[in-house]
Swiss-Prot record:
One of its GO terms (biological process) is AMP salvage. Its EC number is 2.4.2.7. GO terms for cellular component: cytoplasm. One of its GO terms (molecular function) is adenine binding. Catalyzes a salvage reaction resulting in the formation of AMP, that is energically less costly than de novo synthesis. This is Adenine phosphoribosyltransferase. It catalyses: AMP + diphosphate = 5-phospho-alpha-D-ribose 1-diphosphate + adenine. Homodimer. Its main location: cytoplasm. Pathway: Purine metabolism; AMP biosynthesis via salvage pathway; AMP from adenine: step 1/1. Belongs to the purine/pyrimidine phosphoribosyltransferase family.
Amino acid sequence: MNKTQQQLLINAIHTIPDYPVEGIMFRDVTSLLEDAEAFKLVMELLENKYKGRGFTKIVGTEARGFLFGAPLALALNIGFIPVRKPGKLPRPTYSQAYQLEYGEDILEIHQDALTPEDNVLIIDDLLATGGTIEATTKLIRRLGAQVQEAGFVISLPDLGGEERLAELNITPYSLIQYQGE
């Protein structure tokens, strides 16, 4: 990504202070989605990064991971698997509790969504503490699938998510990093 492209993405992502709780600087990717040029650029950059890498499925985390994971799956001609909050998936599920930077939650995946033959790429909008991706990784591995990489639009390196993913042997990649926030 060149500097012009990077600046386009930075300009398209709005920062909302003290949301959802005081002390959080929320990076709003929904503003990026409103900018067709920026959204298209994100999808092209992710496609170029991951095409031809042998992934068989993309797992996207609720909810903003769906916004980038599903179109990327289409571009790569592979399936998309949603990981959702409790009670949102109709077939039998596995659940995993996790901590996030401003609370606690649970994620679920369909029990039949993946097989040991699957090589999975996780996609989400933002990497902060890594709790969401740790829970997602545990769900994927519980189904026997392989997962070693996760892609993000934004990462906040100072919150420790990259280190947390390294402990899980997950290599993170992000388009934009916000240091010191």
